Amino acid sequence: MARLQAIYRDKLVPELIRQFGYSSPMQVPRLSKITLNMGVSEAVSDKKVMDSAVADLTRIAGQKPVVTKAKKAIAGFKIREGQAIGCMVTLRGVQMYEFLDRFVTVALPRVRDFRGISGRSFDGRGNYNVGVKEQIIFPEIEYDKVDALRGLNVSITTTARTDEEAKALLAGFRFPFKN
């Protein structure tokens, strides 16, 4: 069992029941999935860029990503329908908790000029999105072997009904929110 999964079961569930007055432990919000998405606009002109992006995301997530393709052609961006434009991976279960642990304790503190993450990035339904500007903040990525700095989006999907419940859940996982 992952460290954060044990913290959730032993400490967070009773704490959230007390805080929000749930009648059953099954009402307590929990993480359902974490999706990592990397848009690779340079892949339009150079196919090798997509291979290195897939390799980076594989190292970060510990699981092979799916290459996302354009749904329709956009002439202004020189994109044709079906062309590879990014990659994404969905984490669930133990891998999700392991990634979240590394993200909060190792990767986020390595961000330059880090002062906490915004508490405004909730979507109104209890899900949280955070953008990472450089993939080199993850310890799995070797700085010398990086061909280009790429950002990625981390979407944390919870079963929480409100943003307040989701923020309490993520704060219990020691998310460094700004005050």
Swiss-Prot record:
InterPro entries: Ribosomal_uL5, Ribosomal_uL5_bac-type, Ribosomal_uL5_C, Ribosomal_uL5_CS, Ribosomal_uL5_dom_sf, Ribosomal_uL5_N. One of its GO terms (cellular component) is ribonucleoprotein complex. It holds the Pfam family Ribosomal_L5_C. GO terms for molecular function: rRNA binding; structural constituent of ribosome; tRNA binding. Keywords: Ribonucleoprotein, Ribosomal protein, RNA-binding, rRNA-binding, tRNA-binding. NCBIfam families: PRK00010.1 (NF000585). Belongs to the universal ribosomal protein uL5 family. This is one of the proteins that bind and probably mediate the attachment of the 5S RNA into the large ribosomal subunit, where it forms part of the central protuberance. In the 70S ribosome it contacts protein S13 of the 30S subunit (bridge B1b), connecting the 2 subunits; this bridge is implicated in subunit movement. Contacts the P site tRNA; the 5S rRNA and some of its associated proteins might help stabilize positioning of ribosome-bound tRNAs. This is Large ribosomal subunit protein uL5. It comes from Verminephrobacter eiseniae (strain EF01-2). The lineage of its organism: Bacteria, Pseudomonadati, Pseudomonadota, Betaproteobacteria, Burkholderiales.
